[in-house]
Amino acid sequence: MGSNSSKISDLPKNEYLKRLSGPEAISENDPFWNQLFSFSFSAPTSSTELKLLEEATISVCKSLVENNPRTGNLAALTKVFLARTRELRLSAECQNHIFIWQTHNALFIICCLLKVFICEMSEEELQLHFTYEEKLPGTYTLCVLLGSDSEDLLEELLCSLIQLITDTPLLDITYEISVEAISAMIVFLSCQLFHKEVLRQSISHKYLMQGPCLPYTSKLVKTLLYNFIRQEKPPPPGTHVFPQQSDGGGLLYGLASGVATGLWTVFTLGGVGSKAASPELTSPLANQSLLLLLVLVNLTDAPDIPNPYRQAVTSFKNTQDSSPFPSSVPHTFQINFNSLYTTLCEQQTSDQATLLLYTLLHQNANVRTYMLARTDMENLVLPILEILYHVEERNSHHVYMALIILLILTEDDGFNRSIHEVILKNITWYSERVLTEISLGSLLILVVIRTIQYNMTRTRDKYLHTNCLAALANMSAQFRSLHQYAAQRIISLFSLLSKKHNKVLEQATQSLRGSLSSSDVPLPDYAQDLSVIEEVIRMMLEIINSCLTNSLHHNPNLVYALLYKRDLFEQFRTHPSFQDIMQNIDLVISFFSSRLLQSGAELSVERVLEIIKQGVVALPKDRLKKFPELKFKYVEEEQPEEFFIPYVWSLVYNSAVGLYWNPQDIQLFAMDSD
């Protein structure tokens, strides 16, 4: 490659890489390793740059695959790295920049090679490559794994990465190696990307769920969570770990000099400080930590061993909680819930933060109880509502997660009451109407109804409808002081459903007539469409009825909207599917219509509301028929991993810092999906 070369495409010609991947065995104490690890460059950031690096690595790997059975150089490289990691903590404490820099570079090389190996070969073949040792010329064998002196180098490497993540103090000089270790663990598990089916057993599963890695479970999960919570930014370029060149030059690359004699010269590709990072990537460490955490939590259970990382995530407690952990709960730890809550509120623009929030609310009772007791729930709910409001800009999975979070929250009556007590001013992102003052509860209703209407006209996803309506139903008995616009939108949605019902009914009638005259043409299933729309209408009527039955006196604006559009409900009074639920609505409409009639014509809005408020007191409550309380609970579908594992890996594919996979190699999810 030479000291002046700066192109990634030159990497396969580089003398050090050629020697590593060539036919000559390199012993672990050869000075070559220091030379190999003494490079510096601005890390590739764009997909184009990362693709070039990947292609260059593939070329090196082909040679290594061919020669490694004779040389054992992959094992030697790994052992040199492992020896260095044992001294890493001391080096950090002693501010040994050069040692940390070289160890980072060793890990970077291993990670690049590992990524290509995992894509190109089976796990068994990969494991085999880590067992080859240096042999006499003309012969090659592998270590006998079952022998008394055998070692599983791949497992040792994974354990070393976990220890590096959990035990290395986070300093400016260790930031990059911490990120690289997390990236390497993601790469280690990336074999899932190259399988259409969800992997239920693999070598990496075995390593992580039993053996020497297992005791680090809670420590690893806690570290990854705190990395996410702290959102540590990378050190400024001036405090980079790469050492400045001394007068003698030697093997070290000087950042300012533009001269290098190590493996790679500076890649003039940009990097830290070259361009403004997107908001999600202001902390590569936090981003990468969260992605790894989600991957670990969503690993499938082993046949006889539940996923320990999921156990850790579902059972951790607040640092202020002094109660003992149940003895039956493994992998326990404590974390600062206030800090966790604050970061979750701030980071909801990303899919992965929303997925973490969902996971914690759904599976960790301690977190759920804590969050529902907060007096500032608007900080959490508003970002979720904003995701739903901009539904057309979000992928469907992100929208689902946001909706399910709302559904889980609305299972709690205390939440449903408190959101109507929180008054918000000037919601700038809500553009359909100026909302100078509105309760959080009314805003939630507006956004959920808007999501339903969007779904009706665009995606027509029944699953989306069901979750939206379930959240509204859970809230309905606790509706309080609904904003007039929220009340109008409830009735407007019913109006839209009514028109859709009439249209489908007309189409079904015409279709039936057509079928009588011609039996050859296949007809659309309007009966199915009608059944679905009637189910949704029934749900809306139950929501309105629930509010009228339980909190009529708190909601004059809903009664006003009901009276204003009373004709809408006429056609459903005698409909067999809605007769029972229409009784109370019909009674309320009749009662208040009569009182308005008695008060004369040309009444102002203020006067009508006054009559409604007076009438509420006079309405005989015993005449309202009681219905079972509307309560819906979110339950994960069977085999949730079929949804979550492809989703998590799509987030890794799209959001991981500095990791690139060829889209043509991806089997787990469709590349054209959102």
Swiss-Prot record:
Could you tell me which residues are lipidated, with the kind given as N-myristoyl glycine? Answer: G2
Tell me the keywords, alphabetical order: Cytoplasm, Golgi apparatus, Lipoprotein, Membrane, Myristate
Q: Which GO terms describe its cellular component?
A: cytoplasm; Golgi apparatus; membrane
Q: Which residues form a coiled coil?
A: none
**Which GO BP terms apply?**
bone development; Golgi organization
In terms of domain of life, where is this protein from?
Eukaryota
Protein localization: Cytoplasm; Golgi apparatus; Membrane
Which Pfam families does the UniProt record give? Answer: Dymeclin (PF09742)
Q: How does it sit in the membrane?
A: Lipid-anchor
Task: Show the InterPro entries listed in the entry.
Answer: Dymeclin (IPR019142)
Query: What GO MF terms are annotated?
Result: enzyme binding
What main location does UniProt list?
A: cytoplasm
Summarize what the UniProt record says about post-translational modification: Myristoylated in vitro; myristoylation is not essential for protein targeting to Golgi compartment.
Q: Which family does it belong to?
A: Belongs to the dymeclin family.
Instruction: Cite the record's note on assembly.
Output: Interacts with GOLM1 and PPIB.
Q: What does this protein do?
A: Necessary for correct organization of Golgi apparatus. Involved in bone development.
Indicate what this protein is called per its UniProt record.
Answer: Dymeclin
What organism is recorded for this protein? Answer: Rattus norvegicus (Rat)
| Classification lineage | Eukaryota, Metazoa, Chordata, Craniata, Vertebrata
User: Which gene is transcribed and translated to give this protein?
Assistant: Dym
